[in-house]
Curated annotation (Swiss-Prot):
It is found in: Cell membrane. Component of the Sec protein translocase complex. Heterotrimer consisting of SecY (alpha), SecG (beta) and SecE (gamma) subunits. The heterotrimers can form oligomers, although 1 heterotrimer is thought to be able to translocate proteins. Interacts with the ribosome. May interact with SecDF, and other proteins may be involved. It comes from the Archaea. Its main location: membrane. One of its GO terms (molecular function) is protein transmembrane transporter activity. This is Protein translocase subunit SecE. One of its GO terms (cellular component) is plasma membrane. Keywords: Cell membrane, Membrane, Protein transport, Translocation, Transmembrane, Transmembrane helix, Transport. It comes from Haloferax mediterranei (strain ATCC 33500 / DSM 1411 / JCM 8866 / NBRC 14739 / NCIMB 2177 / R-4) (Halobacterium mediterranei).
Length: 57
């Protein structure tokens, strides 16, 4: 395990990284929000189906 090599790798990545533009940030936020919404909706649908089935929740 070469700590100096690892630190140099991290510094190189940070130098290449840049702050996203407002348009990129907005698009990523919308996609992440839609994903969170869909996962929540799927969970709600599963809960609703399980509560209507006999022996469910």
């Amino acid at each position: 395990m070469d700590v100096k090599y690892d630190l140099n790798s991290y510094v190189r990545v940070l130098k290449l990284a840049s702050t996203p533009s407002w348009q990129e940030f907005s698009q990523i936020s919308k996609i992440a929000g839609a994903g969170i919404f869909l996962v929540g909706l799927l969970g709600f649908i599963i809960f609703a189906v399980m509560s209507f089935l006999p022996g469910g929740v």
